[in-house]
């Protein structure tokens, strides 16, 4: 049975939650052993797959879990805004470290390696490919190229001003176009994740609301401060 067929079965049984274990950089949780522990806990709690960034984290996670791992490498390049798995060398390294699915930036922005060449490299390694996209056009182009899944990962993150709500309209449009779509980006409540599935998502990736303690504490602190110190008393 193919990996995607296995995932289809897990999604039907467990519900389609992919957990992204990517701590805030520099956080006390930003440690491969801790990332691996979070990943194992997520698997035991019913995650159908995991999203892991960085070779060290992937190498720590892979021996502990049996669910598929979506892996990527983030880089800050001086000559390109693309951060997610920008180099062909990254694809090869992730494949050798045990990634099942390799995620790359699927936008049309200036980049060191073309989207098509990254896709070809992933498939040469016998891995499934995920395109992290920002728009309907990006995602449809990647799907037509032959990506195994497209994510709404970068919707709202490639221009000024990040929306608060997830892009459910993009999920719905991609599903209607026949894409295997992973809803990702700002799914901070179970209700939002469930709505994405109702809009046709194949699965939903949740990161900050599960694995970024600083973000979760920030949400609670903001709400509590507003309750304790209303604007008219500040």
From Swiss-Prot:
Organism of derivation: Klebsiella pneumoniae (strain 342)
Example GO biological process: N-acetylmannosamine catabolic process
Keyword Isomerase listed: yes
Superkingdom of origin organism: Bacteria
Gene Ontology CC terms, in alphabetical order: cytosol
Entry protein name: Putative N-acetylmannosamine-6-phosphate 2-epimerase
NCBIfam families assigned to the protein according to its UniProt record, in alphabetical order: PRK01130.1
Function: Converts N-acetylmannosamine-6-phosphate (ManNAc-6-P) to N-acetylglucosamine-6-phosphate (GlcNAc-6-P).
EC code: 5.1.3.9
Family named by the database record: Belongs to the NanE family.
Gene for this chain: nanE
Keywords: Carbohydrate metabolism, Isomerase
């Amino acid at each position: 049975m193919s990996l995607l067929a296995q995932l289809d079965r897990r999604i039907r049984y467990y519900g389609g939650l992919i957990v992204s274990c990517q701590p805030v950089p520099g956080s006390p949780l930003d440690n491969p052993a801790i990332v691996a522990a979070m990943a194992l806990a997520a698997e035991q709690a019913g995650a159908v797959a995991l999203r892991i960034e960085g070779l060290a984290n992937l190498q720590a996670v892979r021996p502990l879990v049996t669910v598929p791992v979506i892996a990527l490498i983030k880089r800050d390049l001086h000559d390109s805004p693309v951060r997610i798995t920008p180099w062909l060398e990254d694809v090869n390294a992730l494949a050798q470290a045990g990634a099942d699915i390799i995620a790359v930036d699927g936008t049309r922005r200036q980049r060191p390696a073309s989207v098509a060449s990254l896709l070809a490299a992933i498939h040469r390694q016998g891995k499934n490919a995920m395109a992290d996209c920002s728009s309907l056009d990006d995602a449809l182009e990647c799907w037509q190229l032959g990506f195994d899944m497209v994510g709404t990962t970068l919707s709202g993150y490639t221009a000024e001003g990040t929306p608060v709500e997830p892009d459910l309209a993009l999920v719905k449009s991609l599903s209607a176009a026949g894409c295997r779509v992973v809803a990702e980006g700002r799914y901070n409540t179970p209700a939002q994740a469930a709505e994405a599935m109702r809009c046709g998502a194949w699965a939903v990736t949740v990161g900050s609301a599960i694995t970024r303690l600083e973000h979760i504490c920030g949400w609670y602190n903001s709400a509590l401060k507003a309750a304790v110190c209303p604007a008219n008393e500040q």
